[in-house]
Curated annotation (Swiss-Prot):
Topological relation to the membrane, as annotated: Peripheral membrane protein
Main subcellular location of this protein, as a coarse class: membrane
Species, as recorded: Eremothecium gossypii (strain ATCC 10895 / CBS 109.51 / FGSC 9923 / NRRL Y-1056)
Ranges annotated as biased composition (Low complexity): 32-45, 651-662
Keywords, comma-separated and alphabetical: Membrane, Vacuole
Domain DEP, residue spans: 1149-1224
Superkingdom, taxonomy of origin: Eukaryota
High-level lineage: Eukaryota, Fungi, Dikarya, Ascomycota, Saccharomycotina
InterPro entries the record matches: DEP_dom, DEPDC5_CTD, IML1, IML1_N, WH-like_DNA-bd_sf, WH_DNA-bd_sf
Family label: Belongs to the IML1 family.
Record-level GO cellular component terms: GATOR1 complex; vacuolar membrane
Name used for this protein in its record: Vacuolar membrane-associated protein IML1
Amino acid sequence: MQSNLLQFSNLRTGNLRLASTNRGSANGGGSSTMESGTSGAGSSSNKQVNMVIENNTLTIGGTEGKRAFGRRLQMDTSGLKVKSKVDQEELESAMKTPISGIPFFNQSSRRSYQFELSFHNTPVSDDCHVLIDVSQLPGAREGDLAELRTYHRSPGTRDKKVYFKIKSLDVEARRRSATTGLSILTGQLRYLLDLPSRSPVWVKLKSKNEHQADLVELHVKDCHVNRGDMWCISSTLLDTCVFTGQRVTYINALRLIVKAIYRNGKKVISGYVGNNTKVIFASESARIIFLIQITEEMWHFEQNGEKTFHKVVNSLFPRILKRWKDIGTYHTITIVFCASVDESGQSFRNIPPGVRLKNTKDYFRIVVDRVNILYWDEIMKTLRKEFMQIIGDLRNTQTDDGGGPIRWSFTPVIKSNILETINFATTLLADQFRVPDLKHTVTHVIIISPGTGLYDVNYDLLKVTCRKLLSLEIAVDLICLSRAPLHIVPLFRYIDYQGELCHSAPTWLSISFWDDNKKSQEWHPRCKIYDVQMMGVTERRDSEEVTLNYMNSALHTTSVTDFMDQYDKEVFDADKCYPLSNENRESTPLEDTSNIESTVLPKSGHEVQSIVWKPPRSSKPLVEPTTVQSVIVSLHQPGTINNSSEDDLTDTSSSNSSPEANESLALASLKNMTQISRGLTKRIVSKLIPDIKSKRSRHSIMATGNEHPRNDTYEDIEDIRKVDCHSTGTNITFLKPTFRSMDAEHYNPPDTVSSHGSAGTDSRRESLMFEKKSVLLDDFAKKKSNVNKYIKEKSLVDSLIHLDNPSVCFSGEVATMLIPDRWKDVYPKYVAKKYTKWRSFTTPAELPITTVHFPSLSDFESNFIFRNHSVSLNIDREVYGQTTFDLLRDMIYIRLLAGFQICTSELLKKVEATGSNEIHEQEIAKVLSKDNYMVAIYYMIIDNEVHRIKCGYNGTIDVQRFLRKNENKMMDTIAKYTPLVRTRYEHSYRPCKMDPLRISRTSLRWNQVDQILAGYYDSMMDSSKIGFRSKFVILPADIPPNTFSSTVNGRKETLSAEEIRLEGLRKLISSISKSRLRTNPEKATKASRKEEILPEVHFYTGSLFEYLADHHDNLEHVDSPAKDAQSADLSKFNRDAELSRLAYELQHGEKPIKLTNRKWHFKNHSSCFVGLEMVNWLIENFSDIDTRDEAVIYGQQLLTDGLFHHVDRRHGFLDGHYFYRISDPFVDIKIEKGSAESPLNSDPITINRRVSASTIISSKQNSSGMIQSKNGDSELLDRQSVNDEGKTIVISTAIDIDLDPAGNSHKLETCTVHYDQVHNPDHCFHIRIEWLTATPKLLDDLVTNWGRLCERYGLRLVEIPWHELCTIPSFDPTHSFIEATLAINPWTDPEFMDAEIFASQKYFYHVHLLESFGFLLDNRASRILQNERVSFNVVYSWGKPSFKYAQFIHNTGAYMAEIRENGDLFLAPNNLYLSRNGIGNSSGSLHLGPKSAIYSEKVMLDFKHVCEDYKKLRSVFWEARDKWQQTRNTLEEY
């Protein structure tokens, strides 16, 4: 009935209206008609009368127009007892009067009105693309939802519908569009409609609740969008309309594209985003990790003679890479070979099902690591090369005589290390605050397997893996290279604690089958008999033909009619149902063909016209009655990935319950058998040819008689039962699937019974077996309510579907459970998964923000413990405009970053009802707004943790945390796992430096996190604080030609390369300083002159310790202001001041300028100051100088007047690191000889003040406990105890900067920047960034601007890992590196061993080797900073350094190096920089070229070759020795 009503929408109650009665019409007098309001605008002559009330008779389906349901319905009411005859006018009045409590329907609200189309160029707002004259649309108000529809009369075009919200034209627009009344913004929407101006369109008002989209898919490209920003973007899209191709802009920084909109199972071009709309984010710049299983099946041959692995390199990868190229993605890929070698020498066929091989070793070979797909040719070349080598690397054993006999063997795929492989990949996401880079979103894992999706696994490891994946925002796809099997896949077999064989289907593993055969209609055998194939039995030869004997049929029949009668009797006779004992549960693979019939179906010859997939009849539920179409997961029809079209890439689980194809499945089995085993059927039919005509007629009758579904239970069973045509009648059983939760063992849900016929002989088979249990025929009458009940009680930890018999077809309700609950929002309603499978590989989606997944009430009450804490906003945060609303948003934001999802389950209302004392019902919200944040409750859920967040009216936010019990005991059952790993540049396998099975994401200390968000944190130097971190270094690069000379104050200045780079650093620091975070009062007032006073970076050359010893009094603490704020207001002078007075103030005033002896490149400059300090001093002390430019002009005037001059008299007065000296006529105090630094101001008060400040700094930091040793070295601790008695010098500066000065964001966008306060131009300049809730795109824009600024001054900004290089393999096993041992040990070689050199610098030769190849120092070893020659502690603003080795960066930024204690070198590529700049639009034109990654690899390999080449290395060491003989200066220790 419902489907017919859809065809006659004008008969709905809301569309019926009372028509005016024409007394002279053919209807007769006293008649009234009800007619549709959906006719054309203003057209009354063609109205169709579908309902007539005449002479007390109601007639539906009049003589005009199309009759509803093809018939006329009448109801005679003349027999009703009424007081008087119903008057027609009274009837009309009564029908027009609204019923109490029901609003009267406005007849114009569903009427279409015609408008003429016009266009405008200036956008009114970001979400408004259509403007309309509201006065021309009756009943419309601003904010209502409307539909714009186009009608195309040409045969090649289709009608288009665009939804928009009513936005009125302004006065000027109405004047210009007086005749049109509707205007569309020029751009994508105009292109989408493809209509010229003044085209007619029709507009109709629509209901928001009835017309909201089901799913909107947004695509992200070339930027990192975290899940917190995804939530914010989803919130901004609420109550808006979107269309395909629309560019969505967030905070004027993030730009996303609407790629797909789904509604009611169809892909539409426009939709309304309502409360129930799911917004999904997919990435076009993701990190893809390919894990290729290397098993013995990789060397098997296919039917066409192709090796299995050749399918990977010749069809699968080229197809995927081509698809990426066509879409324009910027993925970076990592390819890993995963192999398990069996050293037992026994056949796996002797191992029982579900049991793993014991004597095995796992190997992981990193083929490529984070390489951009732009280098696809090099990727494929490396892939082919590595595959040819891996068999020799793993199976050849080295003997003493140098031989390499072949031993061992690869494990078969069924016994492979599938769970260990998945755990190996999850190590990359163990830390939720370790961002790979700022250019990529989403990490996706794709496993390529030569098998069929069946694996034997360890039970304990399976539980640990399921638990781990529930806490990570990662999706895993499995691509199988074999043909789809006849059982449920993916399928895990294991032995449980009772010693029984169990089968489980994981919900977190999505499987597909790759088929590169374009002839999809071609038949192929479904059973794999590899040994027979290799003997050539299955090959067709011209010279000879192998004949197989006919199969003996147990049915002794002489005609097709008797054959079918006997078949039906065996299937439908209840007396033939025999129980099957446990001993007789096996059958021969060749004879057990029922699964073949139920799985393999011929592909439909016609194209599917709608996006709703119509499945084959064998994918229907076997028990449940036919229902409305719904997308389920088919468990017995594995999909194939075909290289011909996107629709051919299917999932094992893609089917619908369709009202079509309801004929008997027993008959369908005969049809399928005819098409699958065509040869065998012909032989059977040839014997029974006399009765062929009766067979055809019987076939036609049966097919015709099953068009309509039947309600009788036994008839339903008769329709859906199917048995092999070769059944003997003695082994007919009914299989019973059982579903239960793995971790909720106390819960036993009722069995769900489905029918499935199986047949076979008493023969046994030694391969895969599935338990079969017999049930009575009456069990088939069970309803699907049991299944629904189980689904409702599905627990939080249920990520496996347990199966007693995986060969049985599932019902639709149970099949949907194979879609993981956390990822269900990714799939549109009523759309088969096969239509989204290619997008999973090309543009993977991020974990959805919301979920309906929640533990059952019984599970929640009994298995969770309760914790709570409260947090309120620090009053100090109010000066930045922060409120409780902002704190609540940040708390939800940070939890989304940690992998939580916002829960919207209906069970939450019951949870609230049982545990709340509130009188009014609380709102369970998913969107935060200022209207509801005081009354809404937010439930956030992750694997084993549930958070309930509620804001009270007093401003206190209460957090209730529910933690699952006994979560830490699962890991105790897992043995230590140490696989062998070989990275890209290594020559041999080595033990992995981490245990992939035990690396998991730990829960955060949420009380501490919330307190930090509220503004309660003690020190920026707390090393235990959480947050995101990025580290950058600035390296020298080529200087643009037009930068060497410039004009300052009318004077042409020519700068050296070093001076230009120092000027670039000063400009960068100036940019950072001016971006500092300001309070609201500071923003409201005019910028003071102290904003022009820039912090000083102390540049030096030579030894760091000598400089610190000489200038430690001039180093200011990181938290101190650049200058005293009050001094800027105590201006004493103006530009008319006398030079003599200025000279005195410069040397003897209250705040004199620092005049010191400075050493620069072995040249001493006595009694000088820096130009930057002079500019700061002028701004502080002159009332009529407000900017740095004015100070430079006045300083040039003082230099011209002779007050001071440049030390080399090469420059005029410049703002920067330029040395100047007061002219001799104005100097009256000489510097004391022999002192490294003698302040010209001998004021004891000033000196005491500086010393006192340093002492206070030391006491503060030592008392805070933040500066602690981590490595436990006793010598280091002793050195620290000595240094603690002295002062602490902080050699970097921290500043909080504002990432959003324009105020586009809805939240406070801030981060902390740490930069070096002491810098040697020969080394790297460091910038570190720390943030927590800032938008990554704003940070990326900030870094990009810094890179462009550096580029103009001959500098290169390079991102490097935050952690020390040697520690990276401990948390990222895929990161490649090289260990190089020098061919000459300079410490023992008599030719280079020199005690004098090693006394100054132990690693003199090593450092010279690195510097000669373009390396610059990045970090010193921490032990060097605890030098006995200095009596103070050296720390950074971000914490105390803990580097074990000295680290160097190559001047290209492409790779790094470390010097080990034994003199070996540790090299590794800088993947962060290579992947970031491979995109091609990062730091201006400094991005790497097309072959830069390959070039950097060549440079690194060449450097390693030099290290291992005796002659070349000896030449380099001789250069180092000559350099020492020439200088003989004290060397800086690294």
